[in-house]
Curated annotation (Swiss-Prot):
It is an enzyme of class 3 (hydrolase). It comes from Deinococcus radiodurans (strain ATCC 13939 / DSM 20539 / JCM 16871 / CCUG 27074 / LMG 4051 / NBRC 15346 / NCIMB 9279 / VKM B-1422 / R1). One of its GO terms (molecular function) is acyl-CoA hydrolase activity. Belongs to the thioesterase PaaI family. Its EC number is 3.1.2.-. This is Putative esterase DR_2321. Keywords: Hydrolase. The keyword Hydrolase applies.
Length: 146
């Protein structure tokens, strides 16, 4: 289907390539270079190294990259013993991260109930470094189907 461009001219839109089934494709977390370090219902840690592609216009780690790291830790911890989907998230940013720095998202449960659970995720500079950002997230959850 031709689409008109501002200033004249056209370009043709083609159908997107067929999606590869998830197990064979790279996940979003893999594309960003994330690694799961620990995964238990009491503590989950996910890490990545900030690359040039993850920088914002100021030369520091993009907020979306930091949010994505926290969100991955949130997704992992909340789905270990239940089927869970995010109902609400909030993130506060305290410090900037630079290219080459290793960031670790440390997720712990604040409260886990039958249908709702809230988790705290601290994004740290390195394994034990300062907290760069704090993510709080609540999921709607149900028991995993066998």
């Amino acid at each position: 289907m031709p689409i008109a461009l501002a200033g004249g001219g056209f370009f043709r839109v083609s159908a997107p390539p067929a999606r590869t089934p998830y197990p064979e494709a790279m996940s979003y977390a893999e594309v960003l270079g994330m690694t799961i370090l620990d995964a238990s219902p009491d503590l989950t840690r996910v890490a990545l190294t900030v690359t040039e592609a993850g920088l914002n216009m100021h030369g520091t780690a993009h907020g979306g990259l930091i949010f994505s790291l926290a969100d991955e830790a949130f997704a992992v911890i909340s789905n270990l013993d239940a089927q869970a989907v995010a109902a609400e998230t909030h993130m506060s940013f305290f410090r900037a991260a630079r290219e080459g720095e290793r960031l670790v998202a440390v997720a712990t449960p604040e409260r886990v109930g039958r249908t709702l659970a809230t988790y705290r995720i601290e994004v740290r500079r390195g394994e034990e470094g300062e907290v760069l950002a704090l993510f709080l997230g609540t999921v709607s959850r149900r028991e995993k189907q066998s």
